[in-house]
Amino acid sequence: MEHSSWHALIKAQLPEGYFGKINQFMNQVYVQGTVYPPKEKVFQALLTTPLEEVKVVILGQDPYHGPGQAQGLSFSVPDSIPAPPSLQNILKELSDDLGVKKSHDLTAWAEQGVLLLNACLTVPAGQANGHAGQIWEPFTDAVIQVVNHLDRPVVFVLWGAYARKKKALVTNPHHLIIESAHPSPLSVYRGFWGSKPFSKANAFLKETGQEPIDWLR
């Protein structure tokens, strides 16, 4: 993380010594019990999508809390693991919008400039939101602010009430915000179906002279 294009800019947004607190927190929780994702994957979103390549941000809440699911990218799971319900619904909406993506590992999106960021970067096994409010939110808010300060137009995809609160951090008029209900089975019928976020994001990227994302990869 220290050698990534993100490090200095995130650090500048945070109180002095905050990175040290994050390291302390991680050293503590990974010793105390099972935590997801694996420690080496906690910053995977930032390592896979360098700041200079960000075109789209898809904001999640926290990692999946079952064995083998979380890989440090919001909503994504390895292909060896069945897609959780929210991801199934994302891929169904993609299928209705642009076509079928065969893989439910979203790494190919991240490699094309889609920052798959969770607001909370770790979770205790079996406890959704178990690390919420402890350390991560100021850090991931700083990530959003760093992207917000870019001159290059970026698409922010905000699904559900939690993600939509982060709209307050996106103040740059160059950027596009696409928001809808969350893809979880509880809320998918409240406006996620038919929202076409993928084609909308690509239309904006083309309008602003950028390469669209190949969402089917």
Swiss-Prot record:
**InterPro entries the record matches:** UDG_fam1, Ura-DNA_Glyclase_AS, Uracil-DNA_glycosylase-like, Uracil-DNA_glycosylase-like_sf
Q: Name one GO molecular function term.
A: uracil DNA N-glycosylase activity
Q: Which GO terms describe its cellular component?
A: cytoplasm
The EC number(s) given in the record are 3.2.2.27
- The active site annotation covers 62
**Which cellular compartments is it found in?**
Cytoplasm
Q: Which PROSITE patterns match?
A: U_DNA_GLYCOSYLASE
Entry keywords, A to Z: Cytoplasm, DNA damage, DNA repair, Hydrolase
Q: What is the lineage of its organism?
A: Bacteria, Bacillati, Bacillota, Bacilli, Lactobacillales
According to UniProt, the reaction catalysed is: Hydrolyzes single-stranded DNA or mismatched double-stranded DNA and polynucleotides, releasing free uracil
For this entry, list what GO says about its biological process: base-excision repair, AP site formation via deaminated base removal
Q: Does the keyword Cell division apply?
A: no
Role summary: Excises uracil residues from the DNA which can arise as a result of misincorporation of dUMP residues by DNA polymerase or due to deamination of cytosine.
EC top class, in one word? hydrolase
* The organism's place on the tree of life at top rank: Bacteria
Q: What is this protein called?
A: Uracil-DNA glycosylase
What family name appears in the similarity comment? Belongs to the uracil-DNA glycosylase (UDG) superfamily. UNG family.
